[in-house]
Structures are given as structure tokens and as C-alpha cells.
């Protein structure tokens, strides 16, 4: 087979044999590091991988040849938890955070999520589209090729749908692949204050059926937390969503452990997100149910909290984990997955291989894209992040710098030395 594109002489390729399930426990520590590696691409797919000189049959008169001495390649990075589409910003809350005002107190004062809800409700489709596109551009320039994007800053049907429509439009227009999550249950809107059950009924009866009918989202999510939605309320919504055919995610155990992990396990959610306050019993329940733990260390960093999710304990117990940005305007205003990956080492005490497995193959399982992306594997899409680094460890050792040299998306050179092509 003659390749369309042949990428050769990488210092290292980060490869693995996808076992057919999210990596857990000791599997997280394993990868195949191919020295002097090459990748052959045809019709947007990886058709060959190896070390040294490529087979002669891969090279034809039209084959594009590029050499990458001194560089490494990983699968395209996957950010599987973002709040991508929103209006406004919340830098005016930063001084309160520095003064130690708790997040839930800011929310109770009309700030936090509800502040962004007001800004998002007043924002036009075009405003939201352009703002979200800029974030996606930034992500792409840092090596991200697939992004999960939640609604949740409307808390009414008109605005929630506008957010989902923006995601759908960007999925068509932008190189990054987007996976849509419906999260109208991100907070209790002011018009339903004191009556969350009534709001959930509106979501179940009036919103979810239309989202499903129009295929606007693949996942449904809820914020199960003190002063937001209880475990029973979360179970009520997610069970109805599951009956309608949605895959499930849940924000759980971020500030307090109030039963969200139990709901995730009972309903076999694909992932439980945050988990800073998870207990040993909660870890065991998620392992038993096969729920992926989606950890968001940049949120803990941004909130200036001391308690990070117990990633080391989770992996050692046999749990599958991912890492994501939680990109949002309040608790985590970043879109930099390289920073998150470095926090995975510095603050969660994970090894570089564990972090890379978390943000590639496990993240692909978290967004139900494991058949297409998440590993440098023959037959998968050629989503490739190429770093200006001599080896895998250097990605984490030399921190706080964008080390991306190039990005390939579906076999097309999409980013080249700081420019989107």
C-alpha cells in the first residue's frame, strides 16, 4: 500500500495496544515507546507504524515525506470535560477568590454559574460561536483534537438549545471533533429557586425529548452537589435520560460527598467528574460499575484548594481515570491541556505514561470515540500531536510552555509551528 503521507524518524512514538476497555491499575503504567518511529497515513487513517526505515511499498511518487528528528508523537490529546460555550467572563470574582471567599458563597451572592447564565442568555448565536471558536483554536494549537462540550449556562430551553446549536455548528466547521453533552441541570435557575424538582420536570418533559429527537447531544450530565442538586434529584433526572437513550456523566464529590458517586455506579454512568472528595467506598463502587473517573486538577489549582482528587489511590485500586481542563469562565478559566497534564504529574503524582494514557485512550473511551481515536493504532484516524521534545518525560519536565510543533487531524497537517493552517 502506498501512503499519502509518511512521517519518519521520530525520537519516540507513544503507542499502546488498546485492550478493548479503558486502562485500569497496572495497565495505566504501560505503553510501547517506539524509537526512531514512523507513521504512514492514507485516506486520513493510520495504515502502518514502525521503527527505522519504512517499508519501500509505502513510498510512491505522490507520497509526502516529512522527517521529525528530535521530535516525539502522541495521539491527539482529548479534552473530555469542558464548558465550552458561554457568554461573558468572571475575572471580577478573582479578587474574592484571592480573599478566600468560598465558591458556594460566591454562587449564593448571585455570582458563579448564575452570573454566566445571565451573560449567556443575553449573548447571540454569533457571539457564542466566535467566542467558542477562539477557545477551540487555542486548544488545537496545544495539541487537542477532540473535545467534549457541555451546555448548562442557559438553564432555559432557548439558551440551552443555542449552546447546543453552537456546538453542532463548530463540529461541522472546526478541525476539532466535538462531543456534545446536555447539562441544563448545571444549577437551579433563579426562577426555580427553592423548587429544583419542578425545574427537573421541565428538563425531563420539555427539553430532553427534543434534544434526543434532534440529536443535539449524546450525553446528559448533572451537578450533584451541596446547594445544587441532591443525589435523589440527580438519580431522578439521569434515570429518565438513560431511558431516553442518553449516555450519562455526573459532576460528583467536588465540594462534598453527598451520594453522586452512588448514582454514577447505580446507573452505570460512563464517567463521574471532579471526585476531589471521593471516599474509599466511593472508589470501590466506581470500579465495580466500570465508571471512569474524570479528574480536573486545574480546577483545584484555580480555586486555590489543597485537596486534589486522589488519583494515585484510584489507579492503585484499579480504577480507570482521565484528566480534563474543566474549561469554564469561573472555577477553571483555562483551555490548556498541557498544563493539566503537567498538574497530573506535579499535583496528582502520576507518571508521564499514566498521564498520557489518561488523556488519550481513556479519554477516548470517556467520550465514546475509542474506535476512531485515542491511540496510534493501525486503522484509527491519524490524529497526531507532534511535540518539540526529545522524549516523553520532557513534556512534563519542561512545564508551562506550549511544546506543540505540529498537529495532524484525520491525516491533514492542521497546525504548523504556532499557526492553524
Swiss-Prot record:
Which InterPro entries does its entry note? Amidohydro-rel, HutI, Metal-dep_hydrolase_composite, Metal_Hydrolase
Record the organism.
Streptococcus pyogenes serotype M6 (strain ATCC BAA-946 / MGAS10394)
Query: What is the reaction catalyzed?
Result: 4-imidazolone-5-propanoate + H2O = N-formimidoyl-L-glutamate
Which residues take part in binding N-formimidoyl-L-glutamate? 153, 328, 330
Q: Which family, according to the similarity comment? A: Belongs to the metallo-dependent hydrolases superfamily. HutI family.
Q: What is its main location?
A: cytoplasm
UniProt-recorded name of the protein: Imidazolonepropionase
Coiled coil start-end: none
Q: What is its EC number?
A: 3.5.2.7
What taxonomic classification does the UniProt entry list for its organism?
A: Bacteria, Bacillati, Bacillota, Bacilli, Lactobacillales
Q: Where in the cell is it found?
A: Cytoplasm
A GO cellular-component term linked to this record? cytoplasm
CDD domains for this protein:
Imidazolone-5PH
Q: Binding residues for Fe(3+), per the UniProt record?
A: 81, 83, 251, 326
Amino acid at each position: 500500500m502506498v501512503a499519502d503521507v509518511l512521517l519518519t524518524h521520530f525520537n519516540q512514538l507513544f503507542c499502546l495496544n488498546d485492550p478493548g476497555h479503558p486502562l485500569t491499575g497496572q495497565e495505566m503504567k504501560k505503553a510501547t515507546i517506539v524509537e526512531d518511529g514512523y507513521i504512514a497515513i492514507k485516506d486520513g487513517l493510520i495504515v502502518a507504524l514502525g521503527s527505522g526505515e519504512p517499508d519501500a511499498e509505502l513510498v510512491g511518487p505522490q507520497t509526502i515525506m516529512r522527517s521529525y528528528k528530535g521530535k516525539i508523537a502522541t495521539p491527539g490529546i482529548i479534552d473530555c470535560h469542558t464548558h465550552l460555550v458561554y457568554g461573558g467572563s468572571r475575572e471580577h470574582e478573582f479578587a474574592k477568590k484571592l480573599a478566600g471567599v468560598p465558591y458556594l458563597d460566591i454562587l449564593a451572592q448571585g455570582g458563579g454559574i448564575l452570573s454566566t447564565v445571565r451573560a449567556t442568555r443575553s449573548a447571540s448565536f454569533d457571539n457564542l460561536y466566535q467566542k467558542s471558536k477562539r477557545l477551540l483554536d487555542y486548544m488545537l494549537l496545544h495539541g487537542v483534537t477532540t473535545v467534549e462540550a457541555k451546555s448548562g449556562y442557559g438553564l432555559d430551553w432557548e439558551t440551552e438549545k443555542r449552546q447546543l446549536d453552537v456546538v453542532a455548528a463548530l463540529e461541522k466547521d472546526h478541525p476539532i471533533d466535538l462531543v456534545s453533552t446536555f447539562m441544563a441541570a448545571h444549577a437551579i435557575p433563579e426562577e426555580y429557586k427553592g423548587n429544583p424538582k419542578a425545574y427537573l420536570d421541565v428538563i425531563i418533559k420539555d427539553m430532553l425529548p427534543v434534544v434526543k429527537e434532534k440529536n443535539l447531544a449524546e450525553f446528559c450530565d448533572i451537578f450533584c452537589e451541596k446547594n445544587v442538586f441532591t443525589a435523589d434529584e440527580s438519580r431522578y433526572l439521569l434515570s429518565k435520560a438513560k431511558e431516553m437513550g442518553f449516555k450519562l456523566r455526573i459532576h460528583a464529590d467536588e465540594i462534598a460527598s453527598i451520594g453522586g458517586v452512588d448514582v454514577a455506579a447505580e446507573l452505570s454512568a460512563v464517567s463521574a467528574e471532579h471526585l476531589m472528595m471521593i471516599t474509599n467506598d466511593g472508589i470501590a463502587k466506581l470500579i465495580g460499575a466500570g465508571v471512569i473517573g474524570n479528574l480536573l486538577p486545574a480546577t483545584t489549582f484555580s480555586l486555590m484548594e489543597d485537596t486534589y482528587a486522589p488519583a494515585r489511590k484510584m489507579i492503585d485500586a484499579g480504577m480507570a481515570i482521565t484528566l480534563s481542563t474543566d474549561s469554564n469562565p469561573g472555577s477553571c478559566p483555562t483551555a490548556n491541556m498541557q498544563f493539566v497534564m503537567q498538574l497530573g504529574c506535579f499535583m496528582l503524582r502520576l507518571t508521564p505514561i499514566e498521564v498520557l494514557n489518561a488523556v488519550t485512550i481513556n479519554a477516548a473511551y470517556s467520550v465514546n470515540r475509542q474506535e476512531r481515536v485515542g491511540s496510534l493504532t493501525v486503522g484509527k484516524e491519524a490524529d497526531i500531536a507532534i511535540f518539540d521534545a526529545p522524549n516523553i518525560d520532557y513534556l512534563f519536565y519542561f512545564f508551562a510552555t506550549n511544546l506543540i510543533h505540529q498537529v495532524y487531524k484525520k491525516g491533514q497537517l492542521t497546525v504548523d509551528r504556532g499557526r492553524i493552517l
